């Protein structure tokens, strides 16, 4: 019986204390309207799981905030998109996560939808290598 209790406590501790929200390398498609194509770049972003719960009884006095794995700190990097027309602005600035945490999704800076377009979406349909 003590083994079952220990295992249960261990699982609870693991779920609460050991959030696996961490930096991960991803490839994103970047595009410039003036260039009419996309290129792929490697960057760092946050991914993983956070402890959350959905209460059965909704309490209007206590808002239900679902925590998500999101950035805590960002830096911005700039890359020159090759092959653009000479008159076009070929610089593209994108965010790079440097620290992650479990927190409320900030819809002012993040796509908080269930199914966003995804990091490899290209509206022009053409990827250049």
Swiss-Prot record:
Q: Where in the cell is it found?
A: Secreted
Q: Which UniProt keywords apply?
A: Disulfide bond, Glycoprotein, Hormone, Secreted, Signal
GO biological process terms, semicolon-separated = follicle-stimulating hormone signaling pathway; G protein-coupled receptor signaling pathway; regulation of signaling receptor activity
| SMART domains in UniProt | GHB (SM00068)
| Keyword Ligase attributed | no
Give the CC-aspect GO terms. cytoplasm; extracellular space; follicle-stimulating hormone complex
Q: Which GO terms describe its molecular function?
A: follicle-stimulating hormone activity
Q: How does it assemble?
A: Heterodimer. The active follitropin is a heterodimer composed of an alpha chain/CGA shared with other hormones and a unique beta chain/FSHB shown here.
The record's comment on protein family reads:
Belongs to the glycoprotein hormones subunit beta family.
Function description:
Together with the alpha chain CGA constitutes follitropin, the follicle-stimulating hormone, and provides its biological specificity to the hormone heterodimer. Binds FSHR, a G protein-coupled receptor, on target cells to activate downstream signaling pathways. Follitropin is involved in follicle development and spermatogenesis in reproductive organs.
Q: Could you tell me what this protein is called?
A: Follitropin subunit beta
């Amino acid at each position: 019986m003590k083994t079952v209790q220990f295992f249960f406590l261990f699982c609870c501790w693991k779920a609460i204390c050991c959030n696996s929200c961490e930096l991960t390398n991803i490839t994103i498609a970047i595009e410039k309207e003036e260039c009419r194509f996309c290129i792929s770049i490697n960057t760092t972003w946050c991914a993983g799981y956070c402890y959350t719960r959905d209460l059965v009884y909704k309490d209007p006095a206590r808002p239900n905030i679902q925590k998500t794995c999101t950035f805590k700190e960002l830096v911005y990097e700039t890359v020159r998109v090759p092959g653009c027309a000479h008159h076009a602005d070929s610089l593209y600035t994108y965010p790079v996560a440097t620290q992650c945490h479990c927190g409320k999704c900030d819809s002012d800076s993040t796509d908080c939808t269930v199914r966003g377009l995804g990091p490899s979406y290209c509206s022009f349909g053409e990827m250049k290598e």
